[in-house]
Amino acid sequence: MHHVTKVHFGPLLSEVRTKIDSKRPILRYLVDRREGLKNTHPKELLVSDFSCLHSPFSLPDIDLAISLLLNFAKSNKKILLYGDRDSDGVSSTCLLAFFLRSHQAFSDANLEVMVSSESDPYGLCKEAITKIKKSKPDLLVTLDFGSSQADEIDLLTKEGIQVIVLDHHEVPVRIPKNCALVNPRRIDSNYPEKKICTAVLSFKLVSAILFRLSSEWNQLYSKTNTDENGKNEILYFLNGIKYSKGQLDSIQDQNNKNSLDVSNPLPYPEDFTTNVPLDDERKLFYYQCQKIPSFFEQLEEETDLAGIGTITDMMPLIGENRHFVKLALESLTKLYIGDKKRKGLKELLKELKLNPNGITTKDLGWSIGPVVNAAGRMGKTEEAVSLLLSETESEAKTRAKLLLSINEERRERTKRNMDRVERYFARKPERTTHEVVYCYEPDMEPGVSGIVATRMVDSYKKPAIFIAPDNGDARGSIRSYGPENVLTLLESLSEYFLHFGGHPEAGGFSIAIDQIPKFEAALNEKAKLWLNEDNDRPKEHLIETDFTVLPEEVGDKLLKEWKDLEPFGQGNPDIKLGIQNAKAIHLTPLSGGKHVRFHIVGSGSLKFMIWNKGEEFQTFMSKEGSFDLVGSLEENFYQGRTSLQFIVEWFGKSGT
């Protein structure tokens, strides 16, 4: 909190309510100001509906992937699903495995499921190749990696192994050939959403298979459009994708002209209505899907893992991702209180003691996701997979308890590493003045480098790198602070790495121990160049509130409007409220003073919480009569009861 340079307080909430003529003034105000929501119809923000999802058939190579899966299953050939160890990799692998095991079209499939180990380098490394060859699959499906590993895929195809890659990571100039590469980031991808996780890609593949097996597959529709000059144009729709006549002819030429009848298309269903305004493609695809018996019923349960992957892989909660998360929350709530097929996931919800009246985005990001991720971090990814694929209630209960114990081990390891980090910077305070905060010690423990790097960013308000020894080498994580692209920095230092990769916001690498001093020596100069070239990097740490409120305005009425904009996360941050000239009363230290709970004059019974800065706040309050604060509302479920509380992100002198 003491690192904040500037706080900008937004408009008075009361003035916004007065000026905006709408039943939902908060929604209308924020939609117009949040970049990721600007082009979304407000009605679409309020629903969780399959109609808002795009057709999967604009994903590159999706048709080839379906054909390979169907043909290899029908021939009783071995299919190996190989997923990454993180939550998205586990979620995507289990989602697809569940479907393939349960659908009759794959009843003859010889299916094996495998996930990478914490000790393995990322992706199709030497160790992974060895495991794959030992398994002897006819068809390999990689989940959450593979886009940048053309050489390794060439090697596998020469061994007679066909490959499908489901991945959402950055795609290099040279992409793998001889395989079905389903990645929305491909330069030739026409899919409207680029930032979707691999669990969503698994969902898309499942929905595409169900559609492919229906009578609606390759059913052509047409519509006549008249432009402003009165000229008519016939548009064609195939499997949810719009084509001109020329594009349709090209498709026929590329395939077999006899495989697609264009002579008698069905008319576009102009009279068909949906809950929200949709573009022609989504509207027609939804219309077709509704005609398929049990289509949405089969897909409903698949949304849970798609939502978990979306949240835990920190995808932007705009566009289609919003709908996946909202659908997942509904599905998980039904799973919790009902008798659904995912016994393992249900037992995990029960062990976590979540609110049975409604699973929340916070539950996905702070409870479910970390537990699934912990297995991979602690070198026990297979335990998370075994839980999610549990077939009996007794097995599920045992595995859920085991996974929670693994997560507790992860917490203890993280705490030990953070204690070492604090001692490290106490000895070497100059390290915190560099452009990138960096920490490596030989006694650091592996598996939690991403968590530690994130906490370093939170503490020092700078990009951070944390490295720990791992199986004879070392592995590191880098996290961004602002909009800077950390992959650019890693690329400039790539000569020191064994492997590296990731996203613009978060990356990872492996490095030989003897290369670490050379890496350290080069890091500062490379970081200076990197940040000097990054014009988007903030020059100061700024907190901006969406609204300034009076204490008496913060309550259940505001919470109801607040929920219109959920789910909150990347791309759609929680609504920040500012309160000025607040007066704190009834201070209650918690956990030996580490945290603090209090009320403020005028807010009634609403509890205000400050985490990890309890002593600092109490010292501050001993000198100040009133103060300004910034934070967000939160519903807290504890011991069977739900209460509203205000989580304080920042506090400071009034008027600062």
Residue ranges and their predicted role:
Residues 8-139, 159-160, 211-243, 249, ...:
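Hydrophobic helix-and-loop "lid/oligomerization" segment in the mid-to-C-terminal part
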Residues 98-101, 109-165, 170-198:
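Hydrophobic, small-residue-rich alpha-helical packing segments that form membrane-like cores
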Residues 142, 164-166, 170-216, 291-315, ...:
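Conserved phosphate-handling catalytic cores of large alpha/beta enzymes
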Residues 439, 597-602, 609, 646-649:
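Short, acidic/hydrophobic/Gly-rich beta-strand patch recurrent on exposed beta strands
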Residues 515-520, 626-656:
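OB-fold single-stranded nucleic acid-binding module
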Residues 547-551, 566, 633-635, 652:
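Beta-strand elements of well-folded, non-transmembrane domains
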Residues 550-600:
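Long, low-complexity segments enriched in small/aliphatic residues
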Residues 604-620:
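Beta-strand/loop nucleic-acid-binding surfaces
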